[in-house]
Amino acid sequence: MQAGNNGGAKLKNDEFDNLYQKNINRRETETVIRRSIPVQRDLTGKILPNQVAYYEEIEREVTFGATHHILDKDNFDSYIYPTNFEVREYQFNIVQKSLYQNTLCAIPTGMGKTFIASTVMLNFFRWSKNGKIIFTAPTRPLVAQQIKACLGITGIPHDQAAILLDKSRKNREDIWTQKRVFFTTPQVIENDLKRGVLNPKDIICLVFDEAHRATGSYAYTNVVKFIDRFNSSYRILALTATPGTDIASVQEVVNNLNISNIEIRTEESMDIIRYMKKRYKEKIEIGLTTEIEMIIEQLGIAVKPVLQQAVELGIYDECHPSQINSFVAMQKSQQIIANPTIAEGIKWRNFFILQLLNHVGQMLKRIKIYGIRSFYGYFRNKFSEFTTKYNMGKSTNKIAASFYYHPILKILMKNCDVYTSNSSFIGHDKLQKIINELSDFFLNSRLDSRVIIFTELRESALEIVKTIDNMGSSSIRPHIFIGQARGKENFDDEGFIRKNKPKGRKKADRLKRLEEDKQKQLSKAKQKEQEKVERSSRRTGSSEEAQISGMNQKQQKEVISKFKNGDYNVLVCTSIGEEGLDIGEVDMIICFDTTGSPIKNIQRMGRTGRKRDGKILLLFSGNESRKFEKAMEDYYDLQRLIGQNFVEYKKSDRILPSNITPECRKEFIHISAENNELNNMEDSDEVIRYATQCMLGKVPKSKKSKAKAAKEPKGKSKTFFMPDNVETGIVSAIALVNKKKSNSNESETVIKTECFPNLDDIEKDMLASLSSPVKPEVDDYKDGTFQKTDRFEEKITGSNLKDMLMSFSKRDEESKVTSFSSDGNYVNEPFGNISLGEKLDINDDFASTPIVKADMNIGQYDRSLIENNSRGGVLFKNAFEKEEGLLKKSEKVYFRDHYSIDNTVVIEPIPNFKRYNKSCLINHNPQVENILNLFKGINENKTQITIEMNRSRCIARGIEKGSIQLTGSDFSLANVMVAQKNNEADIVWDTSKTNKNSHENLNELLDSDSDF
């Protein structure tokens, strides 16, 4: 395909699909059929304009080629059906269809969904040589159930299985590579697919538990979408008891999971009814007490003016005050806020009216369904919050004020205070019914019987626990079972008043307020601690504490364990107990409230009747019975629609060759000792821990493997999974254009210029290097001359200029120095023969830093000493041996022979106090003495000091302009001589190498006392 001038030809959707190759063996052909339709014509027979003479029918046919998985030809001629348990016809039929199609298995709870999944996983494990089989569930207990079923029933080798539940990613890539059967959560799969740790093309079987969650952007949906980009040849098995609430939600699950077939069974299905344990449903309608009816009437009187105003404004339908619905009021308030055509003032007035109706609707719901205690706790919190804000002027909502300040509510609150102050008061007849049912049940039931009570509200769950505990029966032991979130705290009116009251401007007022806040916090903390101690002394203390702070996973596991062991025999649950609780000893379920969701109702009722017959007690009050019947009716209609093929399925790959039809082999599976151990475990965490140990124990790591692993880099590069026949990597721009050969004869010239620092910078750093004596440094010595290095270029600065010109270290008298003779040759002369008055000529290459000494006798190290010692050792190091310091041994010997202890400073990191233990005053060295004299003269404004400073500046400018040159291996000046007068080093000009004009100008500068 060639690009034109318009920027390139456009690709059609099918061409994009072919280029992308998102499906390995999936092919989709589209057929468009046009069918004519009647149209209007004029008198001449022509079709009138703007009419379509036909409509299009689009037919899509999906075909699959050979799978890319490596199949085991010795095994795919048969499939195994375990006979370790009773062979059930519905399970056998579902397994047979699930092997060839992506299946949604919707059967009642306790009917063996895990056995079906394990059988399918076992056969795909046999059919493929390296395909990955993954089971995923949203919670750890559900994963543990499948581990028991898969390893403890079907006999899949435990050394081929892996459990991926922890957040740690250590060795995750190796586990995905080495193992074949995996038990994990969908979030782990999604993250590892995105990180490139798991190759989507390796997956051959994927099992989803609680598949009704595969809606929206849940992890189930994201996993399938990601795999479909690279792999279409894999089997999906979706397990659930309730596929959805309506046909639309079921269709969404089918689309998201690529379902080709739905196997749905109900409790009335012919092939399942004989395996179902009997569940006796008892529906009891509970009436309202006189106290509740009185409170409802009082609320209606207080809210009636607001309701009439809402009806007159047309924002709420007319109804009796006792029938106000909180959900309807909330929906209408959201519609008003989202409507931009309404004026702001009218919009917020209507919003506050509906907000109040929403709160009143919540109050009515609580008092009708849960009782007076639950209602009054909610009412008291709302009343305290509004009145506190309104009295302080923080709220001006007069609509709500007309309700909360209604006189009849004072009577209501007074009566409720009397009711709730009595611990034995029963706020709803549902609670009395629970007491009666539990008394009769445990009187006639087995010793190992258990009861689960479901309610939606935490405060209602705690009230049920306290009510049962007040019975005083030792045979009934209740406990709460809720989620991890902390309980919502009530409105703190004292804290709000203290925070928003006028603050004094004085410091004393602020300190007083801070002290009051501190005292309030301390008293509040003491009160909470005291309440906690009081709770711990009661039988329901752990339930009360859980209602306040929530229950973490450890506490939840402990409660379930005690419930199974019999420490508790009544469990009061919120929605957290609707899924995953597989306790066969539960003989009765009590639904304290009901919901409009058939999924929740069925999940609740499915907690009993698993190992033996059970009883379901449904308590209704208000409109709950009508809501329950409507939800169940919709559920049965949904099952009927699914059975009548009202769902559009997606075609899936058969995976096995079309000419192969495996035969069923019903076999008794012999379970290994390790796998059989799982069948004796009840705790889900114990199952996961044991399976993990088996997985890790079969892969011992030898010492050699550890050594090899240590050499490997810690961070492995991310793997990007791409479709087949795709050019990977980054293509550089130069690879996309025509290359031009360059002329190889062309030469490149690099000009290097030396840059000297500005004099201003030199002057600032004048005294930077005049510190304690330092070790002389030399550069590499080659062919009898010192070679110039970059290090020297950095050292020619004004900070050490005076040292270079005026200071030299004390040397051996027998040492020699290399100088130029008259004929230009090198001459080695003893250093002692050179006087300060002589002219010293050296090259630009400066190799050492001279040091000033008081006697100014010039000496130098022998060259062999420089070559052997100056570069031979490391100047700086982290550790020093005993009797070792910054100086080398030869240097220590030299300084010990030529300098007395009184005139030297120990510069070793660790002073040798054993040798130099005499305390005395140490004189300043000449450099420090010169610095002190220099600053002393500056403070006293001495003219001679100013002239000396200007003299140094002149020398620096001479070096910059070239009047002074640095040449040779030893230090000398081209036109400057060093002389000694009165033990002071003076600089004189050598007139033989400068012209007269420059000599006169320089003398004028040197003799002047100007400050430039």
Curated annotation (Swiss-Prot):
Protein residues bound to ATP: 107-114
Domain Helicase C-terminal positions: 430-654
Reactions mediated catalytically: ATP + H2O = ADP + phosphate + H(+)
UniProt cross-references to Pfam families, sorted A to Z: Helicase_C, ResIII
Locations listed in the record: Nucleus
UniProt keyword Zinc present: no
Basic residues bias (residue ranges): 498-510
Enzyme class: hydrolase
UniProt record, GO biological process: DNA replication, Okazaki fragment processing; donor selection; double-strand break repair via synthesis-dependent strand annealing; interstrand cross-link repair; negative regulation of strand invasion
InterPro entries in UniProt: FANCM/Mph1-like_ID, FANCM_DEXDc, Helicase/UvrB_N, Helicase_ATP-bd, Helicase_C-like, P-loop_NTPase
Keywords: ATP-binding, DNA damage, DNA repair, DNA-binding, Helicase, Hydrolase, Nucleotide-binding, Nucleus
Recorded superkingdom: Eukaryota
Entry GO CC: nucleus
Record GO terms (molecular function): 3'-5' DNA helicase activity; ATP binding; ATP hydrolysis activity; DNA/RNA helicase activity; flap-structured DNA binding; four-way junction DNA binding; four-way junction helicase activity
Subunit-level organization: Interacts with the MHF histone-fold complex to form the FANCM-MHF complex.
Family statement drawn from the similarity comment of this UniProt entry: Belongs to the DEAD box helicase family. DEAH subfamily. FANCM sub-subfamily.
Function: ATP-dependent DNA helicase involved in DNA damage repair by homologous recombination and in genome maintenance. Capable of unwinding D-loops. Plays a role in limiting crossover recombinants during mitotic DNA double-strand break (DSB) repair. Component of a FANCM-MHF complex which promotes gene conversion at blocked replication forks, probably by reversal of the stalled fork.
Name of this chain's protein: ATP-dependent DNA helicase MPH1
Protein species of origin: Vanderwaltozyma polyspora (strain ATCC 22028 / DSM 70294 / BCRC 21397 / CBS 2163 / NBRC 10782 / NRRL Y-8283 / UCD 57-17) (Kluyveromyces polysporus)
Lineage: Eukaryota, Fungi, Dikarya, Ascomycota, Saccharomycotina
